[in-house]
Amino acid sequence: MVVGTKKYSNLDFVPTISDSEDDVPILDSSDDEKVEAKKTTKKRKGKNNKKKVSEGDNLDEDVHEDLDAGFKFDLDADDTTSNFQGWNFLAEGESNKDDAEAFVKKDVDLDKIIRRKGGLVKMAHIDSKQEEETEKEKVEKENDSDDEELAMDGFGMGAPMNNGDENQSEEEEEEEEKEEEEEEEEEQEEMTLEKGGKDDEIDEEDDSEEAKADFYAPETEGDEAKKQMYENFNSLSLSRPVLKGLASLGYVKPSPIQSATIPIALLGKDIIAGAVTGSGKTAAFMIPIIERLLYKPAKIASTRVIVLLPTRELAIQVADVGKQIARFVSGITFGLAVGGLNLRQQEQMLKSRPDIVIATPGRFIDHIRNSASFNVDSVEILVMDEADRMLEEGFQDELNEIMGLLPSNRQNLLFSATMNSKIKSLVSLSLKKPVRIMIDPPKKAATKLTQEFVRIRKRDHLKPALLFNLIRKLDPTGQKRIVVFVARKETAHRLRIIMGLLGMSVGELHGSLTQEQRLDSVNKFKNLEVPVLICTDLASRGLDIPKIEVVINYDMPKSYEIYLHRVGRTARAGREGRSVTFVGESSQDRSIVRAAIKSVEENKSLTQGKALGRNVDWVQIEETNKLVESMNDTIEDILVEEKEEKEILRAEMQLRKGENMLKHKKEIQARPRRTWFQSESDKKNSKVLGALSRNKKVTNSKKRKREEAKADGNGARSYRKTKTDRIADQERTFKKQKSTNSNKKKGFKSRR
């Protein structure tokens, strides 16, 4: 509050509300102590401005030269919240593109090629009659949504699927139904065989109660933590700068996972936590980390926290989450170590020893081995986000190397939406009686997610046309964010070209793109420059882009866990969302659908989600498919032209590389060679071993006993004796008896 009355305008001492006028001291003023007022030098035009100048001159007489005239008290700083627009996917150095714009072209502009071929101009034409029919279908679907709910006795039961398929005769339908029944019987037999094998191997797969009691902290700790619910972040006894950062993000009430984990993490205990996608797991580990770092030694720069993540985009997002929460905390620094970005910039940043380093495993090991003055000797906290993915075969070697480099006396925090790792895989992490906190039932989708399934049958060739029609129905104006998941990078690229030729602007995200292209695709999608993003499972974990309304599974995932991560990109943080999945006829596809329906039925009391069968007008889709097939030559031309441009760019890059080698030969040769913890042969061997372990078949009890007998007998083969074996044994015994009898007779004669 500022006191600005004329009565006290010449006083150096300004009274407050609590001071009485009688107590105000009379201060003598001398000419020497007069402060010269700053005069305004800006020229102002107009009559109104002249008045402002005169008022400003009078005010300037009262302003001390050491004070900023434009300073204002922000009385409501703690209560105001910014309009949060999502996390930033620009890495350090990427946002300042003024200097970077001058660099040579590195990537092919695919949209430019598509426009040259007539695409991205206008949307593909749909007849008005068909549009009217689709509107009627929408109304019917809304009215009959309850009739379309899927039952547990198979896929499509309880839903009138494929009403629009008029070309199929009744005989063909009956034959298909018989085939499906036979397939289902075969699948059930396979499932029972698999179950039989698994039941026999319970000792190997499931952890015993004794092992859990020895490894984990008492269950009461986790149960008590889950019961605690806090009304706001103030009740968690967090510091004021952290609370201010949370308020700026609009965080008001802690989510269940945050209420359970933050108090335990502040105590320094190890945690293994799981909750549904979009429940605030990143903030659940970042808040206690920042709170603990407030009390670090101020004068000693060292890296105290390592956060490991499986993908680069997720690492960049988590880094931005941490920076936003710690924006009002002074002295906490962040470092990013991910592949695909400038290596030298990362080395310079890591030389300053940031408090928190967020990294992917490969680049983290690279920096530890090859970056000067970067070490992990003082690390106190290790965080593994998407921990179940990090513990899989692909990261096993890197993870073992990192565990050997980090100090053993540290706090470990493991988080994932599908955290179901066995003790055997967790032993290498050196956990110390971790507290196990599982907020939601395992393998459960978000509470407000509507899961829809489209049965493809034998129409795989119609999937591109189906995707186009579905996106047009779900988002005719192009104002919704839709994510499409595919199995292969080539499929994502081809679909982008097909959709572009049909007039739909889409982006792609997969491992074949450069890191700059990947970040550019995510940012364009986030800013709604491109409403549809076609991606592989690279984007299935962790990415939190606000207001993704629909997820489409163009290709079925390999497992139900991956399916949960995919559909978890929508219906986040209590919002509603929809997923549409194209289901084939394989047993794997059907098992995932069964698991999804089962999860919805088992958690009906806890969730508002539904599992529905979606009706499709296949006649209209076949018309669209004819248009797609007519573009096959154009698609091939675009792919060839793109390949040629890539070859030209690659040749130019090699030319520049050669020029640099000639110009800076001595500097380049003087650089030390970068080392790695594995040789090329070791990498190949680990890949082969990983493939063999993944393809290992489940054995039943008899086979397992035979294998155990072989192992005990040092490879000796055990089998039942045949008739010839028994005859041979009898002959041997007779010979032995004869020889013993003859020896006895000889001995008796010699005694005589």
UniProtKB/Swiss-Prot annotation:
Q: Which residues form the Helicase ATP-binding domain?
A: 262-437
The residue stretches assigned to a coiled coil in this entry are 621-667
Which residues take part in binding ATP?
A275, V276, T277, G278, S279, G280, K281, T282
Report the outcome of P288L: No growth at 13 degrees Celsius
Per the annotation, the residue ranges of the short sequence motif DEAD box are 385-388
What does the UniProt keyword field contain? ATP-binding, Coiled coil, Helicase, Hydrolase, Nucleotide-binding, Nucleus, Phosphoprotein, Ribosome biogenesis, RNA-binding
Provide ranges: composition bias, Basic residues: 40-51, 694-705, 735-752
- Reaction(s) the record says it catalyses: ATP + H2O = ADP + phosphate + H(+)
List GO terms (cellular component aspect): nucleolus; preribosome, large subunit precursor
Q: Which GO terms describe its biological process?
A: ribosomal large subunit assembly; rRNA processing
Q: Looking at its record, which EC class is this enzyme?
A: hydrolase
- Report the sequence similarity comment from the record: Belongs to the DEAD box helicase family. DDX27/DRS1 subfamily.
Spell out the subunit comment: Interacts with RRP1 and associates with pre-ribosomal particles.
What's the protein name? ATP-dependent RNA helicase DRS1
**This protein's encoding gene:** DRS1
